[in-house]
Structures are given as C-alpha cells and as structure tokens.
Amino acid sequence: MEKPDLYVVARFLDIMFSNGPSMKKTNIQMLLGVNYPRFMEYLEWLLKRDLVAASLDEEGTERIKLTPKGIESYHRLVDWIKETLDGVKI
C-alpha cells in the first residue's frame, strides 16, 4: 500500500488508543469496518512504520498494541482531524 487513506489510519489509531493497551486483530478489524484483506494491508503498513507492534499474550493469542511512536502519531493526526474538521467523527 503506497498511499493509505489517512482517515482510515486515524480511525485505526483511535480504536487502538481508546480500547486499551492491546487488542486482537479481529476486534480491531470489526471496529474499523473494513474487510479483512484491506485490514491486513493497513496493519502491515502500520507495523512497517513502527506505529503498532504485535505480540503474543499468555494464551498464545496474537495481540496488537500501539507503540510510543503510534501514540504520538495518534495525538498528532487524530487531534488535528478533530480540530480542523469540527464535528467529524473519527
């Protein structure tokens, strides 16, 4: 994916920031509202840029969490969208 939709990236980061320290991929995908192949493209894009990280929990389930860089990006991108596009829901 060369040019992701920044609104989808913002929604992804917002979901991660708002729903706890880590989440299962399926839960993120359902909240994001995109099909699974498209979700995986965004996840891979975010992983390559160190905005999110994958790890296994104690049960061996893969979980995704925001990195410090992802938290910073969340604040910059999502806050900018909320300020600039007054009334737009992320």
PLM feature segments, named:
Residues 13-20, 78:
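Short, locally clustered residues in the helix-turn-helix/winged-helix DNA-binding domain
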